[in-house]
Amino acid sequence: MTQQSPYSAAVAEQRHQEWLRFVALLQQAYAEDLHLPLLQLMLTPDEREALGTRVRIIEELLRGEMSQRELKNELGAGIATITRGSNSLKSAPAELRQWLEQTLLTSDK
């Protein structure tokens, strides 16, 4: 039996399918009001905290009032994490960016 490289196309496809399966499971959990217990089961406290920090990073990048360095100091996140968020936001589809702006910048916190 040959071991597949962690970078092979087959492994990448399998990981993508696993991700899509998780997304479908999460959608079903939302429909049945089980999303919070599911996310608590699937994510460690550190992972949940990291997701919350990433939402704040995206929110502040969209707001555009702080430099990446200021964000780093305020949120305690690494500059690489903030840079990845910035780069991801730049390559995000326009519809997603518009939705994020509407959802994160105009909603009550």
Swiss-Prot record:
Subcellular location per the Swiss-Prot or TrEMBL entry: Cytoplasm
Annotated disulfide bonds: none
A family per Pfam: Trp_repressor
Origin superkingdom: Bacteria
Keywords tagged on the record: Cytoplasm, DNA-binding, Repressor, Transcription, Transcription regulation
GO molecular-function terms, A-Z: DNA-binding transcription factor activity; sequence-specific DNA binding
Function: This protein is an aporepressor. When complexed with L-tryptophan it binds the operator region of the trp operon (5'-ACTAGT-'3') and prevents the initiation of transcription. The complex also regulates trp repressor biosynthesis by binding to its regulatory region.
Protein name in the entry: Trp operon repressor
Gene source species: Klebsiella pneumoniae (strain 342)
